Every structure is written in structure tokens, then in C-alpha cells.
Amino acid sequence: MKKIVIISGNRIAPAATGGQVRSISIARALARIGHSVHIFSTAGRREDYRPANLRRGITMESTIEPGLKESTHLGLTFGVMQAVARRLDYPRVWQHHMLASGIVPTRLKQALREADVVMSDLPYCPPIPGPWREKPWYLISHNLEHKLLEQGSARQGRFADWMRAVEGAAPQTYTDILVCAEEDRAFFRSHDIQSRMMLPMVRCGVDPRLYSFSPGLRQQMRAKLGLVDEDWLLVFSGSGFAPNVEAFRDIKEFCRAEAEFMARNRVYIVVAGSVSSEAYRDGALIVTGPVPDVLPYFAASDAGLNMVTRGSGSNVKLFEYLAARLPVISTVFGVRGTELMAFEDYLACSRNDLTEIILRFIGSNRVFWRAKAEDVWDRHKHNCDIQDLVNDAISVLPPFGSLR
């Protein structure tokens, strides 16, 4: 057993975004191999900065499961800078500069001294100068951050070239990089001047055990949503990430334009997660707003919907749908980073033909689609199960694989 420290810019458990699902899933997989995994998050979420938490000290400790814990630093310097940057729509450039300059919490330095291996969750958390810099230090890539900044607001776009330089230097900065898709692997490989990196693929897989629901949960959630057995329910889950917001806008427009079609065919779409700041219902559209857990909505649903049309890397929600044994209805772009084949493994759609695709979906019964979803999972689970993905990845990394 070895001590692994994962440095994160924000508290990741419980996961509230696709990125946090990826981070905590990798951490869990490492812990279940037998390592002692310590996530150190340099800032908390808004609700963490309550007087009661601050009175207990500037680090909030939580045990996630045996062998896995998270420490969340609640110091006001990091907290205020995070709040201001978010309010002004700035990326976490400030965080990168602070960590790269060695301006970090004392507790993090202590954790680094005790660590055998260090992992940076995203390039915004670079290696920290100090005696621990000689330890194996890995980057967990979620996507190409500079691509996301290019697609972001005008203010975010100004930092795209800076982030491209940071990511371009990553092959010379880290021991190796855990990539998430072919896109980021190709980028890092093109900047690996010495061709020394393995760049193992850890797709945005999930823990399938979390997506095995109790028999009564489906009926319980559908009753809560006011649905009966004859109603069809599609789920779209997402955070406030810009491509999700745009997809949500398309879903809203579709539900309004096709209100008669949706009502006639008893089809509903539930949008689960913080992609919307408020909960409401408008005809066939059910919006949950921020919720503690989106998984019960997967249990209630008949298919997973993904209308995302831009971004980078791969889409965690696709892997969640597969693990929940949901048939997938998605844009072709939405399945990037997977090996799914259109109309063999999922129903490909666009905003223009979604009506026809829904008709095709409801034209077969649920028994057919459940069997289809099980078959798709069986054929693709090795690329979806985070435990398998992490096991394979570390097996090819000599300094890290030797710790198994």
C-alpha cells in the first residue's frame, strides 16, 4: 500500500458535476486497489463557508470510504479569490499561479511530505515547488482545457493561449498523464519532445455499482414526478458547464415547439442537475434544479438523452447512462471519447430530427430497449468501468504500476 495525494482545486465529493464524477471515480478505483488515497482540495463549495465550519478550523475532513478521504481547505484567501473569479467569469488562472509559486496551505505541504505519489486533477493544479517535487507526479486530464476556453466567453477566451502553453508543457512537467480521450492524447503526444510518455487512456468511466438501483426506486421516483407506467421519460443530466447550458436551451425549445407531439405520445424529458438554477415544470419538460443526487432520475427514466454539440474530451454523462443500463439517444458529437457506433449502440440524433428519433424509440417496447442496453453495456463495459480503466492504466506506468 502506498500513499497517494490528489490535488484538486475544489471539493469533489459528493460529485455534483461530470468532472467531479471523473475525479472521485479515479480516486475510488485507486483506493480499491489497496492504496491510501488522500484528496486535498484547495477550496470548498459556497455552502462550505458557513460559520460553523470555519469555527472548526480551516480544513474540513471527510472520509469517503475505507482508504479514501478528502481534506477541503477553507482558508479565506483561496475562498475569496475563487468567489471573485467566478463572479467575474475568470478561469482558475489565479489558482495555477498560487500553486506554481508554492503559496499553498500548510496542511497540503504536510500531505505532500507524506505522499509516495502525487496527482494533479486538471492543469490548474500544477506541481508545487518543494522537496516533494522529486516524487512521481501525474496529471489527470479531463479534456483539453484550452479548447474549452476557446469556446467560452470572451473573457475566458483571452486565457486560451496561456492554457495551451501550460498544456503544451505538460509532457515536460509531469511523470506521465492519464488522458481521457483520443483528442487530448494526440495533443500531449505531439508535445512530448522526448517521446517518453505512455499517456495511458482512462476514459470517463464510472463505478457501475453506483448505478444498480433498488427495485422500488423507479416506481417511487416516477410517482414523485407524477408519471405512470404508460409515460416515457428521457433524462438529460448536466452541470452549468456552457455546452450543457446550450443543450438545455435546445431541449427547452424542442419541448415548446413539439408540445402537442410530446403530449400525444406521453413523452417527457427530465433535466437533472445544476444546469438550471431553478426547479420548474413546463408541459413535457421537468427541470429539477440542483439536487443532491441525479441517480434516482436515471432509475426513473427509459433512456438517456445527450444533446451536447461542443466541448472537449469526452462526456461523463454518456458513461453514466451506459452504467445505468439506459438506451442512449445522443448527438454524434455527444458520444466522442467512446467506441459507440451510431444505431448499433445508440440512436444518433440532432435538433432537427429528434422528433423522428423519439418516435423510433417509443416504437419498440421497454423490454426490447432494456435488453439492448444490457447488450451495449456487456460489449463496452471494459471501456466504461473505471476500475478496469485505472487498473489497465497504472499497469503500464513503471514508477506507478510498481505500487500495485
PLM regions and their residue ranges:
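Membrane-proximal helix-turn-helix segments that form the acceptor-binding/catalytic region
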Residues: 28, 105-110, 145, 157-180
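Acceptor-binding helix/loop patch of EC 2.4 sugar-transfer enzymes
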Residues: 71-95, 135-168, 204, 209
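A short, active-site helix/loop in glycosyltransferases that binds the activated sugar's phosphate group
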Residues: 127-129, 168-197
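Short hydrophobic beta-strand element within catalytic cores of glycosyltransferases
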Residues: 317-320, 327-331
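A charged, aromatic-enriched C-terminal amphipathic alpha-helix characteristic of glycosyltransferases
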Residues: 366-397
